[in-house]
Amino acid sequence: MSITAAQVKELRELSGAGMMDCKAALADTNGDMEAAVDWLRKKGIAKADKKAGRTAAEGLIGIVSKDTSAVLVEINSETDFVARNDLFQDIVRNVATAALDTQGNVESVSASFYPGSEKTVEATIKDAISTIGENMTFRRSAKLSVKDGVVATYIHSKVAEGLGKLGVLVAVETTGNKEAAAVFGRQVAMHIAATNPLALTAEDVDSGAVEREKAIFSDQARQSGKPENIIEKMVEGRLRKFFEEVVLLSQAFVMNPDITVEAALKDAEKSIGAPARITGFIRFALGEGVEKKESNFAAEVAAAAKG
């Protein structure tokens, strides 16, 4: 099959590999992007991408919290110019506020009333599209709550209060001091913004992802020519390292890399004054996995794709 310049560009962004390697990988896997990433990894050309996804859309992430709940919303625009518009920012903030009184998903939020209006969120966004003159998409929304404790929040690349390019929620269940729990929770939220973990615990990691890593590690280990029993131990070691990289509680804590997040939680219990648990987290990066219309791709890539 014919490999396009856009496919080569996408694989380069996902894998960090060179143009010709990406072209060879796509040709050998009939254009299957996921298989091409695995092909490059087996060759030792690309590293694991914990959450493959192109960040291309404009817009904003909004965060609002109240009592023991907090929400994240993402609303996309066509240009960054509109994302800096006061009306657009008000809409993102108000949609997040509306989400607090719903189940938190896009469907329930869209059908709810827009704050201070008799119109729904969906209708208000449609009206705003006409006013602003640019398409807007209410892409996703999520809500996190605790029975007793705090939901800490963090906005990265902040453009206004509660608005930015990346947002994180962290649920900390505890009967202890809520202010101390919130301080620690915010540190964990900043950690998550930086490390982008796949799951809270090893058990939460998708079994398909684990099997995929195991298959790749096995292929890499067999290239060493070592006996099967040694290969098995090599794979176990690499899987252990994989979990340390993608599981939140097992990751080295960004604020103190000498300890894990789980150990940092135990330390934080001293200031919290009671046992504490991280029960969940949500991370939204603007445009994650969204493909923006291509304008004009570099001529060198087009030439490489043509061969």
From Swiss-Prot:
Keywords: Cytoplasm, Elongation factor, Protein biosynthesis. One of its GO terms (molecular function) is translation elongation factor activity. PROSITE patterns: EF_TS_2. Residues 79-82 are annotated as: Involved in Mg(2+) ion dislocation from EF-Tu. Its main location: cytoplasm. The keyword Protein biosynthesis applies. One of its GO terms (cellular component) is cytoplasm. Pfam families: EF_TS. The keyword Transferase does not apply. InterPro entries: EF-Ts_dimer_sf, Transl_elong_EFTs/EF1B, Transl_elong_EFTs/EF1B_dimer, Transl_elong_Ts_CS, UBA-like_sf. It is found in: Cytoplasm. Belongs to the EF-Ts family. Associates with the EF-Tu.GDP complex and induces the exchange of GDP to GTP. It remains bound to the aminoacyl-tRNA.EF-Tu.GTP complex up to the GTP hydrolysis stage on the ribosome. This is Elongation factor Ts. It comes from Bartonella quintana (strain Toulouse) (Rochalimaea quintana). The gene is tsf.
